[in-house]
């Protein structure tokens, strides 16, 4: 069975904890990350551990493996750091990464952070949008390329020419080191060409439908499609109030509200994203988002 966890708003609705719960009630699940990539931040807590997932699926604390589809970006530096952080917590995560996943480089991260357009429209600052744009411009670097030294070096040179600026040598060698370590971790970080077979598939979405380029308010949208068709069941997620990180339209901001800040809130004001905003929930906007998906029932 295929189940999808989709945010109804502007992101930060609770997709991680929902994915974690669904993994607890089905047999032999696989979490599938199908959109976005390493820019996600999905927090899951259990009795012993709290973790924010960016490079692994949110079923990882339960020992559920992750499949990273070819539509998702991979940040080798972030992936290795999160793998080590999970190991330090006694967790040995397994992730299947599609060979065609786009790779985020230090060049993409710098481009994301210095772009005036990104600052205006909104960015997490981890290179996601720049990676997608570079791929569309045919300067491609994929997960499979990391396993071929000459291909990797050649494509990195081409990417530097594409951006027309250098990066700090520390960032470059940190990236190269992460790539080499990931190759050595093949037992846990696995290169695949198709999704492995499991009994149940939990499709963990990223961000929210109101950031989908076909649904949200351009230009304050993301570079990936939030919705996925063909699921057996959909779980549309919202908080009891509306949230948005950074710039862009948001309902009910002119209405006074008294929303207590959760002391365990993961989302805070961010150097690149900006302020984490809260307003009263607009149920009609939730209805609009669902209508745009054409999901019935």
Where are these regions (language model features)?
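Non-transmembrane, aqueous-exposed alpha-helical and coiled segments at domain scale
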Residues: 1-297
């Amino acid at each position: 069975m295929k189940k999808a966890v989709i945010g109804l708003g502007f992101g930060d609705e609770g997709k991680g904890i929902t994915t974690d719960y669904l993994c607890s009630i089905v047999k032999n699940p696989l979490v599938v990350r199908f959109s976005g990539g390493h820019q996600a931040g999905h927090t899951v807590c259990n009795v012993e551990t709290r973790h924010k997932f960016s490079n692994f699926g949110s079923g990882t604390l339960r020992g559920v493996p992750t499949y990273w589809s070819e539509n998702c970006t991979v940040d080798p530096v972030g992936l290795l750091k999160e793998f080590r952080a999970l190991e330090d917590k006694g967790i040995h995560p397994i992730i299947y990464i599609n060979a065609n996943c786009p790779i985020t480089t230090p060049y993409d991260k710098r481009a994301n952070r210095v772009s005036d357009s990104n600052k205006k429209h909104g960015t997490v600052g981890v290179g996601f949008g720049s990676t997608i744009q570079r791929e569309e411009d045919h300067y491609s670097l994929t997960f499979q390329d990391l396993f071929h030294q000459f291909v990797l070096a050649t494509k990195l040179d081409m990417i530097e020419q594409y951006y027309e600026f250098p990066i700090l040598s520390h960032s470059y060698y940190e990236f190269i080191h992460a790539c080499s370590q990931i190759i050595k971790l093949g037992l846990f970080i696995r290169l695949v060409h198709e999704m492995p077979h499991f009994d149940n598939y939990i499709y963990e979405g990223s961000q929210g439908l109101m950031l989908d380029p076909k649904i949200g308010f351009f230009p304050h949208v993301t570079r990936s499609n939030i919705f996925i068709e063909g699921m057996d069941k959909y779980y549309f997620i919202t908080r009891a109030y509306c949230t948005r990180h950074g710039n862009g339209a948001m309902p009910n901001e002119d209405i006074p509200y008294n929303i207590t800040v959760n002391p365990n809130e993961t989302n805070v004001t961010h150097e690149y994203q900006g302020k984490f905003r809260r307003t009263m929930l607009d149920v009609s906007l939730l209805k609009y988002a669902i209508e745009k998906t054409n999901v019935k029932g």
